[in-house]
């Protein structure tokens, strides 16, 4: 059994994990009169425009604390969304390894290992259950891997265990990921019977020639039949599409989307293929230039225009749905700092003011559970300041941020804290506002991995100077942040209104 996984930073690049040490320089002081010109100059770069979820705030650059905290330690801070939590559960098994995949997966038949893994998942749930007994779970996301590669009996055991250990709300959203060839009609019916009310289907493209180059061995016509059954039985169905393949025509994504719209698919996710990730032998600091950069931007903009013209609304940067027929509460609620319980090998979770990740190997994952411990590899406790900006920055990156609501929730006036930055970005055409609601403009889209990060507290920006020099110089995000320097107009004072 071989586990496939690459260590990645959060910029769509394969690299060693950079860790900041003591900063070597001080952050340049804010000059309100020059800020607009500094931003304009710093953004004259080719950014990595890849619509994906591999963006995170705070960026993973600080030293983590190894070891597994006890549940009461993990949840020692009060939640800013009291009484509610979500669950992410990772199942690493897949029928085969797709050439574009970079997640921790175990391809091929592993029947015995699957049974063992599901058993350990139920034991991990039991470790969390007492600490969460008085709270309600509002969403569950079963990802992978391909969870529907599990047998019907194992899926039934897994879903039953979720309902047994966690108190789901009456309207809880329960999502499971799937792939072509893994959900015959009777399995879809079983999923619905045991509470699944949202299905995400990773089909990527309907171009058979492209599929053959990706190690995706399935019949397009059979996949379409599975989707028709899923829409008929579950209804709330998302399909993952991808573009940027070698030999792909400019119209390939549009043709794929047109077919799905005609099939009545109510939710569509769009991702761009990154050639760097496909080469598992490359480990480098410096990102190469993407010769198809402008083409990818054009294809994505055309796809967005097509979907919005068909009645779809963007709920995240790259996810579009028909509001009356689909929802995606789990992902949206992540950016409200709701507690996210991470289950399974390699899963990443969020306890109040603590980001954590489970062990990356089955051996260590099993060993910790055998010892009665949470299988946590490492964690990072964050300050209240970072917690506030985690919500604000993430919401700006993916949807929009309501400064009035955050002021009410945290007692901090971010409009005053970042007054000069907001004015500069607005004058440059990167930011627009309706009342106290801020959102990125279309002009900002190619820089949506960077512009929201300008709202990071200056204390966090200063940490970037502790990164290796080649990382600071060659990657867009640290390069821009160190060039611009401080962006806070005032100190943050949580609770002060």
Specify the residue positions occupied by each region the protein language model found.
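Beta-strand-connecting loop/turn residues
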Residues: 94, 266, 435-437
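Flexible, acidic/Gly-rich N-terminal and inter-domain linker regions that tether
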Residues: 1-85, 428, 466-468, 474-494
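Accessory beta->alpha helical hairpin/"wing" motif in late/C-terminal subdomains of nucleic-acid enzymes
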Residues: 435-452
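A short, conserved structural fragment
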Residues: 426-436
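Canonical Radical SAM [4Fe-4S] cluster-binding loop centered on the CxxxCxxC motif
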Residues: 81-117, 208
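Short amphipathic alpha-helical interaction segments
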Residues: 412-424
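C-terminal scaffold of the Radical SAM
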Residues: 8-14, 18-21, 77, 107-131, ...
């Amino acid at each position: 059994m071989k586990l496939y996984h690459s260590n990645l930073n959060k910029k769509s690049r394969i690299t060693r994990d950079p860790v900041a040490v003591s900063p070597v320089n001080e952050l340049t002081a804010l000059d309100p009169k020059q800020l607009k010109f500094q931003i304009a100059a710093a953004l004259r770069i080719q950014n990595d425009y890849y619509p994906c979820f591999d963006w995170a705030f705070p960026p993973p650059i600080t030293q983590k604390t190894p070891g597994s905290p006890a549940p009461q330690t993990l949840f020692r801070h009060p939640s800013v969304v009291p009484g509610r939590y979500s669950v992410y559960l990772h199942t690493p098994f897949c029928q085969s390894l797709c050439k574009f995949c970079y997640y921790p997966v175990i391809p091929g038949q592993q029947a015995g290992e699957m049974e063992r893994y599901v058993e350990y998942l139920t034991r991990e749930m039991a470790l969390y259950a007492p600490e969460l007994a008085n709270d309600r779970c509002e969403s569950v996301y079963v990802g992978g891997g391909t969870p529907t590669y599990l047998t019907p009996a194992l899926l039934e055991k897994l879903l039953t265990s979720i309902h047994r250990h966690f108190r789901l709300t009456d309207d809880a959203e329960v999502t499971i990921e799937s792939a072509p060839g893994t959900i015959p009609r009777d399995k879809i019916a079983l999923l619905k019977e045991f509470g699944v009310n949202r299905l995400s289907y990773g089909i990527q493209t309907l171009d058979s020639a492209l599929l053959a180059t990706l190690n995706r061995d399935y019949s397009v016509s059979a996949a379409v039949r599975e989707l028709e059954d899923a829409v008929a039985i579950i209804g709330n169905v998302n399909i993952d599409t991808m573009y940027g393949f070698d030999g792909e025509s400019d119209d390939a994504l549009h043709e794929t989307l047109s077919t799905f719209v005609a099939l009545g698919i109510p939710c569509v996710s769009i991702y761009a293929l990154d050639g760097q990730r496909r080469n598992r032998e490359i480990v480098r600091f410096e990102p190469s230039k993407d010769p198809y950069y402008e083409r990818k931007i054009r294809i994505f903009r055309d796809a967005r225009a097509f979907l919005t013209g068909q009645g779809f609304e963007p709920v995240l940067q790259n996810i579009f749905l028909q509001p009356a027929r689909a929802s995606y509460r789990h992902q949206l609620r992540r950016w409200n700092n709701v507690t996210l319980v991470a289950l399974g090998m390699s899963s990443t979770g969020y306890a109040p003011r603590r980001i954590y990740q489970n062990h990356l190997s089955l051996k260590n994952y099993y060993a910790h559970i055998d010892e009665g411990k949470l299988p946590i590899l490492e964690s990072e406790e964050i300050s209240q300041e970072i917690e506030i900006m985690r919500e604000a920055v993430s919401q700006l990156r993916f949807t929009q941020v309501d400064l009035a609501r955050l002021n009410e929730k945290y007692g901090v006036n971010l409009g005053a804290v970042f007054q000069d930055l907001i004015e500069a970005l607005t004058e440059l055409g990167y930011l627009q506002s309706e009342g106290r609601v801020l959102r990125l403009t279309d002009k900002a889209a190619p820089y949506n991995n960077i512009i929201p990060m300008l709202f990071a507290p200056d204390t966090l920006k200063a940490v970037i100077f502790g990164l290796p020099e080649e990382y600071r110089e060659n990657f867009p995000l640290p390069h821009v942040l160190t060039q611009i320097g401080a962006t806070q107009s005032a100190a943050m004072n949580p609770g002060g209104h």
